[in-house]
Amino acid sequence: MFIKGRAAKTPRGEPRRSSRGGRKLAVVAPPPVLGSTSRPHFRRESIARRRCRKSGRRLAASRKMAATAATVNGSTTVSSSGPAATSVGILQAAAGMYEQLKDEWNRKNPNLSKCGEELGRLKLVLLELNFLPTTGTKLTKQQLILARDILEIGAQWSILCKDIPSFERYMAQLKCYYFDYKEQLPESAYMHQLLGLNLLFLLSQNRVAEFHTELERLPAKDIQTNVYIKHPVSLEQYLMEGSYNKVFLAKGNIPAESYTFFIDILLDTIRDEIAGCIEKAYEKILFAEATRILFFSTPKKMTDYAKKRGWVLGPNNYYSFASQQQKPEDSTIPSTELAKQVIEYARQLEMIV
């Protein structure tokens, strides 16, 4: 249809058709609207892009796993488990740090400050390995032995540093390995020595009830025959008997050098008890006699201890305690008041009957 010599316009959005020359031409689609994704070639392009992105992510993940496996195992084999590979890496790092600590500790004069820093770093690494086993954790034998060896060095380091609270913490952690895992782990060479030190520590702090509680956890054979356990048990018996001279003599028969620290604390405690009794029982005591009773080997040590206690040596070489003793009137018994209370109590009982 022609209007004024021109062909009629095809409505917008419809394909144009042509029959020039008697032949039908192919349908020509109009260009797509900008931003439209409804055309087939747009859908094909978006699908291709998604496939490329997926393949890229898979390739990156495979490369990352290969790098992790190469770092942990020293090869290009892909690790089968991410958490397992991490645990192996942490264990290897802890083992390397432990070897450094062990080398420093085994020196003739170890650097205690350096050992303390190494122990601090190792404890942080062990936290990632659950070095205190619980019911829900499953640790390998290698992990348990490594953690136990580190804690044993920590306990001995605490004694050399004279850090009693630190020693008590290390021993509380070691008991888990000594008692709960004694069937799964080989016996440690330092187990009896450290358990004996723990008993001596409780004895030096006058924690007798805890001493007997720990003693009950040990086999009877170890108590009777093991030299590390037998020594603190004998000291406790001497204290109960009041044989203080045997306690002082036992210092020269210690099973290990590390026992000296707690033995000295125990002897100082005993000296303080004896000195308190001297102040109550004697009005005055000769210098030589005080030196013998308090088990001092030299007069200088006796003089230093007397100054610490506030004792003053008189002109006749006597220590006088008359001013420190209670006056007779302070120790009188209120017999009249006690008699009245007893009579009143008897009267009330008679009324009840």
From Swiss-Prot:
List the source organism: Mus musculus
Enter cross-link residues for Glycyl lysine isopeptide (Lys-Gly) (interchain with G-Cter in SUMO2): K300
GO BP annotations listed = proteolysis
PCI domain residues: 165-334
- Answer yes or no on keyword Ubl conjugation: yes
Tell me yes or no: is Heme among this UniProt entry's keywords.
no
Q: What is this protein called?
A: 26S proteasome non-ATPase regulatory subunit 8
Q: Which gene encodes it?
A: Psmd8
- Disulfide partners: none
UniProt note on tissues of expression: Expressed in the Sertoli cells of the testis.
Pfam families tied to this protein: CSN8_PSD8_EIF3K (PF10075)
Function (record text) = Component of the 26S proteasome, a multiprotein complex involved in the ATP-dependent degradation of ubiquitinated proteins. This complex plays a key role in the maintenance of protein homeostasis by removing misfolded or damaged proteins, which could impair cellular functions, and by removing proteins whose functions are no longer required. Therefore, the proteasome participates in numerous cellular processes, including cell cycle progression, apoptosis, or DNA damage repair.
Q: Which family does it belong to?
A: Belongs to the proteasome subunit S14 family.
Q: What do we know about how this protein assembles, alone or with others?
A: Component of the 19S proteasome regulatory particle complex. The 26S proteasome consists of a 20S core particle (CP) and two 19S regulatory subunits (RP). The regulatory particle is made of a lid composed of 9 subunits including PSMD8, a base containing 6 ATPases and few additional components. Interacts with DDI2. Interacts with TASOR.
- One Gene Ontology cellular component annotation? proteasome regulatory particle
The record's annotation in InterPro entries points to: 26S_Psome_Rpn12 (IPR006746), CSN8_PSD8_EIF3K (IPR033464), PCI_dom (IPR000717)
Q: Which UniProt keywords apply?
A: Isopeptide bond, Proteasome, Ubl conjugation
> Which portions of the sequence form the region Disordered?
1-25
